[in-house]
Amino acid sequence: MLPMITGFMNYGQQTLRAARYIGQGFMITLSHTNRLPVTIQYPYEKLITSERFRGRIHFEFDKCIACEVCVRVCPIDLPVVDWKLETPIRKKRLLNYSIDFGICIFCGNCVEYCPTNCLSMTEEYEFSTYDRHELNYNQIALGRLPISVIDDYTIRTILNSPQIKNG
């Protein structure tokens, strides 16, 4: 009879210990209820990017002097610059400029070292496509300015994001 009583006491202690562990886990879960959500509903909500965000490169054809500094400072020699030497005036004339964003690592060296500031980073980061050859942008595609997330009325922007507060 005595072993049966001690068995019930051990069972009761184990039950209380299990209830305490479950309660501790539940308290941790409840402590997360007053935090802001981490995820956003992507196609309908977008984060406002920071000022120094490195998105798609914008190119101004008229400012470029075809010096090829962007190609020399690029770690992967990515920008393709085609030019022709105009012999009467002894200057280079830019024919074509293209960047393949499927290969680009968005380091920003080309933008930083461009002597004429014809390159700049935009806030556009959506490059989804079914064909990777569509990511090769020529000077016409690079010259288009993207629609700002703030100006697009179909998208709700998220200002109270933990990433923006911390970064």
Swiss-Prot record:
UniProt binding sites for [4Fe-4S] cluster 1: C64, C67, C70, C114
Catalysed reaction, written as an equation: a plastoquinone + NADH + (n+1) H(+)(in) = a plastoquinol + NAD(+) + n H(+)(out); a plastoquinone + NADPH + (n+1) H(+)(in) = a plastoquinol + NADP(+) + n H(+)(out)
EC annotation from Swiss-Prot or TrEMBL: 7.1.1.-
InterPro entries: 4Fe4S_Fe-S-bd, 4Fe4S_Fe_S_CS, NADH_quinone_OxRdtase_chainI, NDHI
Main localization of the protein described in the UniProt heading: plastid
Subcellular location: Plastid, Chloroplast thylakoid membrane
Signal peptide segment: none
Matching Pfam families: Fer4
Listed GO MF terms: 4 iron, 4 sulfur cluster binding; iron ion binding; NADH dehydrogenase (ubiquinone) activity; quinone binding
Co-factor: note: Binds 2 [4Fe-4S] clusters per subunit.
Residues noted as binding [4Fe-4S] cluster 2 in the record, renumbered to the chain: C74, C104, C107, C110
GO cellular component: chloroplast thylakoid membrane
A GO BP annotation: photosynthesis, light reaction
Membrane topology note: Peripheral membrane protein
Keywords assigned: 4Fe-4S, Chloroplast, Iron, Iron-sulfur, Membrane, Metal-binding, NAD, NADP, Plastid, Plastoquinone, Quinone, Repeat, Thylakoid, Translocase
Domain 4Fe-4S ferredoxin-type: residue ranges: 55-84, 95-124
Cofactor: [4Fe-4S] cluster
Assembly and interaction partners: NDH is composed of at least 16 different subunits, 5 of which are encoded in the nucleus.
Family affiliation: Belongs to the complex I 23 kDa subunit family.
Functional description taken from the UniProt entry: NDH shuttles electrons from NAD(P)H:plastoquinone, via FMN and iron-sulfur (Fe-S) centers, to quinones in the photosynthetic chain and possibly in a chloroplast respiratory chain. The immediate electron acceptor for the enzyme in this species is believed to be plastoquinone. Couples the redox reaction to proton translocation, and thus conserves the redox energy in a proton gradient.
PANTHER family noted in UniProt: NAD(P)H-QUINONE OXIDOREDUCTASE SUBUNIT I, CHLOROPLASTIC
Protein name: NAD(P)H-quinone oxidoreductase subunit I, chloroplastic
Annotated source species: Aethionema cordifolium (Lebanon stonecress)
Origin organism lineage: Eukaryota, Viridiplantae, Streptophyta, Embryophyta, Tracheophyta
